[in-house]
Design a protein with these regions (language model features):
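Charged interaction scaffolds used for protein-protein
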Residues: 1-12, 31-52, 70-122
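Short linear motifs in exposed loops
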Residues: 16-18
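A general, composition-driven signal for non-globular sequence regions
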Residues: 20-22, 108
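N-terminal first-folded block
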Residues: 22-29
Length: 122
């Protein structure tokens, strides 16, 4: 599990990535977060200065919302209500933070699995 506070529109917003995220995402949006994040990462790396498709923006909003809701039980129950808290903010400022958080979580899970099979010294 990894947590990070990201500044959005002058507010510190907590995000959390853990093994529960794929399930929470699937239950809320009926989509596969792994496929969606792969698509989002590709769109971001192909067009770092701009030009996201509407689908990419929706994926970003969904992922950001789920990670924020996972970190803070006081997050509003809908994405629209959550987004209404903020003025216009640049996706390019926040998206790298979300992708980094997700990547850190995956790395942490892989390292934990690698180390779980090692015997402890006695």
């Amino acid at each position: 599990m990894v947590e990070k506070i990201v500044n959005i529109d002058g507010k510190g917003v907590r995000f959390k990535a853990s093994a529960a995220i794929p399930r929470l995402y699937r239950l809320k949006f009926r989509r596969d977060i792994f496929k969606d994040l792969t698509k989002l990462e590709k769109a971001y790396s192909d067009k770092p200065e701009g030009g996201f498709e509407i689908d990419d923006l929706e994926i970003f909003e969904n992922v950001a919302y789920i990670m924020a809701a996972h970190a803070d039980e006081n997050v509003p129950p809908t994405i629209n209500e959550w987004l209404d808290q903020f003025g216009m903010f640049s996706i390019y400022e926040v998206l790298p933070e979300i992708l980094e958080l997700w990547g850190s979580n995956l790395f942490t899970d892989v390292e934990a699995k690698k180390n779980s099979g090692k015997p402890t010294g006695n």
